[in-house]
């Protein structure tokens, strides 16, 4: 099972992390597949991401290429994969950042126009294990959910998080304002938040799990959709 990945769009911020992204998502997958083929491994699983569906950034494109490599190797070894979105409280996630800022008494800073769906680590693990042991050769598992019903905006997530911890969200017009007023606001049980229009190139405003030209195949699972990665031929 291959869980090595750089899955954040911010990984594209400079040439060095970009090279590491390509190495982790593409080259290492190819190398371990070659090793698996050489040693007659019975099954190879590699985790993907929702950003591989109709990718608009290099990170998503790298995972799309990884899926295509899996499809190519399915002629020699039994392969499968799974796409899912953000794992709640995982390193680099919004919730992980919120927890760190909360305990360090720092303002919340987040885009206001981005919608996200979170899985628990248990849900992500179950999906990966299910794909590994129940997925047929070349199958890509995807959660079958209505994203528009369960996606949350970052302001909504921040509001709920603060309410749970006994604070009220206080909107500031700049990050400097939020930093300068944090002590006074905390005494009133209010938490300074600066919300802005997303400025990260290649960041999808809403998540999708299935690309425009991708088609699902029939399967026995009520809560899953499956794509045959052997049919993936382009980015």
Residues covered by each model-derived region:
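Functionally constrained cores in energy, signaling, and assembly domains
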Residues: 3-4, 12, 24, 30-32, ...
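Conserved Rossmann-fold NAD(P)-dependent oxidoreductase catalytic core, especially the SDR/UDP-sugar
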Residues: 2, 9-11, 15-67, 72
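Strand-loop microenvironment adjacent to phosphate/nucleotide-handling motifs in alpha/beta enzyme folds
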Residues: 70-94, 99-235
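Short connector loops/turns at beta-strand edges and beta->alpha or beta->beta junctions
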Residues: 6-9, 103-104
